[in-house]
């Protein structure tokens, strides 16, 4: 067997073999896609899903036949492309124009106060300096012996 110092290492691996740990990007398993070194798993799976989606949409007779119309960045139909959709005031033309008259104002005020308390509670947990006070609504009550144990219970 040749030694490494002689410069000729005999191995069963090919010269072009790249170990999986040294390959760039995550390479998962897509059963229908052939394994190549040049493309990542994300690009391969996106291309696979986009090809499947295009064939389904092109073969369907109605736009709602195989699951409806899905917005995407690549499509054969220009109406489905996300960049083609309206971004101005036209997007509100097809929104429902109804209002609720049975609003419970007391309940909505209670929900607003709870939302404010939840935000203060989040600020308390995010605070590293200890200057934000704890919100009393979210303090879980404990029994007195857990807080102040008797001397004979400590042992």
From Swiss-Prot:
Its keywords, alphabetically, are: Cell projection, Cytoplasm, Cytoskeleton
Taxonomy, superkingdom = Eukaryota
Cystine pairings recorded for this chain? none
Where located?
Cytoplasm, Cytoskeleton, Cilium axoneme
**What is the first-listed, main subcellular location in coarse terms?**
cytoplasm
An annotated GO cellular component:
axonemal microtubule
What PANTHER family does UniProt report for this protein, alphabetically? PROTEIN FAM166C, UPF0573 PROTEIN C2ORF70
Tell me the function of this protein. Microtubule inner protein (MIP) part of the dynein-decorated doublet microtubules (DMTs) in cilia axoneme, which is required for motile cilia beating.
Similarity remark: Belongs to the CIMIP2 family.
Which protein are we looking at? Ciliary microtubule inner protein 2C
Q: What is the lineage of its organism?
A: Eukaryota, Metazoa, Chordata, Craniata, Vertebrata
């Amino acid at each position: 067997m040749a030694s490494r110092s002689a410069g000729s290492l005999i191995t069963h691996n090919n010269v072009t073999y790249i170990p999986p740990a040294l390959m760039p990007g995550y390479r998962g398993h897509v059963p229908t896609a052939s394994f190549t070194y040049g493309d990542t798993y994300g690009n391969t799976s996106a291309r696979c899903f986009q090809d499947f989606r295009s064939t389904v949409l092109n073969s369907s007779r109605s736009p709602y036949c195989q699951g409806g119309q899905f917005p995407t960045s690549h499509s054969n139909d220009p109406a489905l492309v996300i960049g083609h959709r309206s971004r101005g005031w036209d997007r509100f033309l097809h929104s429902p124009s109804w209002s609720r008259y049975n609003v419970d104002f007391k309940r909505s005020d209670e929900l607003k106060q709870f939302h404010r308390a939840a935000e203060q509670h989040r600020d308390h947990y995010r605070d590293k300096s200890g200057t934000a006070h704890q919100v009393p609504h979210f303090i879980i009550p404990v029994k007195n012996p857990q807080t102040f144990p008797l001397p004979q219970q400590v042992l």
